[in-house]
Amino acid sequence: MNLINLTNHPSSLWSEKQREEALRLADKIVDYAFPNVMPNSTEREVSILADKVFKDIVTTYGKDVIVHLMGEFTLCFALLKRFQKECIVCVASCTERNVIEKDNGERITRFEFKRFRKYE
């Protein structure tokens, strides 16, 4: 079974912990770049894009997959509905946000992967 990484964060940049957790869920991680959604896109355009991405993933990888789904909210929601209708499990990555504030006021934010959580 494949874990389809439908995000803007390639698995090659994941922490070792995130890769290990993904490989506990599936045999292989496949990166699938989350498409860009322009702010002026209409609901109809987002729906058409969701149909296209959904069809491409199911045609290429089948329905026996887990989808790691993170990205622009309206497209995520549209995709989630399509995947769930076909009983395809989707997960989100859960992170802990760590902020380091420097003396000059600059903030450095780091996100530490903790787990995958199933969309329900």
Where are the regions a protein language model picked out?
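Long, low-complexity, Lys/Arg-enriched
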Residues: 1-65, 78-81, 85-120
